Amino acid sequence: MDYHMDYIPNEVISHQGERFVDKYVDRKILKNKKSLLVIISLSVLSVVGFILFYFTPNFRKSDLFKNSSVENNNDDYIINSLLKSPNGKKFIVSKIDEALSFYDNKMKDINKNNNNNTSSDFKGLSLFKENKPSNNFIHNENYFINVFDHKFLMNNVEHINQFYTFIKTNNKQYNSPNEMKERFQVFLQNAHKVKMHNNNKKSLYKKELNRFADLTYHEFKSKYLTLRSSKPLKNSKYLLDQINYDAVIKKYKGNENFDHAAYDWRLHSGVTPVKDQKNCGSCWAFSSIGSVESQYAIRKNKLITLSEQELVDCSFKNYGCNGGLINNAFEDMIELGGICTDDDYPYVSDAPNLCNIDRCTEKYGIKNYLSVPDNKLKEALRFLGPISISIAVSDDFPFYKEGIFDGECGDELNHAVMLVGFGMKEIVNPLTKKGEKHYYYIIKNSWGQQWGERGFINIETDESGLMRKCGLGTDAFIPLIE
């Protein structure tokens, strides 16, 4: 089976500042206010839609829709085009002004009818989890987004729209307006970093905002970078050392030479699809399970999907969602007598789960595992298969989009991934205008196929593979099933 992918770049989200205002909301008139706001919002959108529809035949003459096509003239395209156009923003503001004037008049009538002498004009909207009726709006709560302030709207409407799209796309839920505000600020900070990086023409890779965009690096690190420091197991019955490596590589390599420039196991049916560890610090399990899956694909011609959840639950040398070691995973995998398939023992992320080794009758095991010398990574990769490795990740890593990663590294080994290939790409130097060869390792990650290049990342190296950026391969193991 061929796992080679075409990688499609996405738009990078831009950045501006954000302003929040405080407003007290009276519960007694909330329901009426909310209904009116819905009616007003629908009215404004209807007016916008009607005007755009009415002038659609002449849209080619308008700068707003320049270089567009009829097929692209859908709701999302129209809204995004309006948001990018100063005249479009002014039009929206004028319609909101009209709606707000109508709303204020209605609110005066409502206040009079309810004999409410303490009500205030409603000036803000909030985005947060509506798990309880009382959470729709909260007395004395701060930080409502002021969408009726002209300067705020003109300066931030694009980013509010982007943040809303981010929330919707990633199914984010916030427990309060205050949390929403804090996440929005983090989102904007990350957006700024992404924009600044992508403006650097010297970098070999691009960034993008993704599901991690509302997390600080400290939060991201504590949740996803949970690899423990490797401690060689003394007197292990299963770990093959340097002496055994020479014997094993000779068995599969013989006297054959190989091209140090490029080899990709995805092109040789040796890599199973990228998975997602979700909200569990289980990178160690995905790295070790993935390399076992690759061995069955390469040696047995079996495409199987094994259970990371069984390792998370039953690898007692490791710490479940709180981290672990690759070599401990292989040790426990052997002690357990093999691993069930993912169908028999499905992944549930960070949900509590007790170990149940009897969920399946057929298990897939390994005989032992091999420690790969850090100066033999390309050789081992080419002749033995994908390798479970450690790496030192920094805050540049989470927002990787495409290209050859040449960013900053972490100061400690904190993540487990898979080494699945290596390659070379000739890139024109923007200063010399000459093509330069850039070598890289191909890494399979466990953050889903929406991250990076369909779940993979390319990290710079040299032709020999001895350059191990970010400590790549300091811990390197291959499971053996024969």
From Swiss-Prot:
One Gene Ontology term, aspect cellular component: extracellular space
Motif (Bipartite vacuolar targeting signal 2): 84-105
Protein name according to UniProt: Falcipain-2b
PROSITE patterns: THIOL_PROTEASE_CYS, THIOL_PROTEASE_HIS
Pfam families: Inhibitor_I29, Peptidase_C1
Propeptide feature ranges: 1-241
Organism of derivation: Plasmodium falciparum (isolate 3D7)
Intrachain disulfide bonds: 280-321, 314-355, 340-360, 409-470
Keyword rRNA-binding: no
Main location, first listed in the record: other
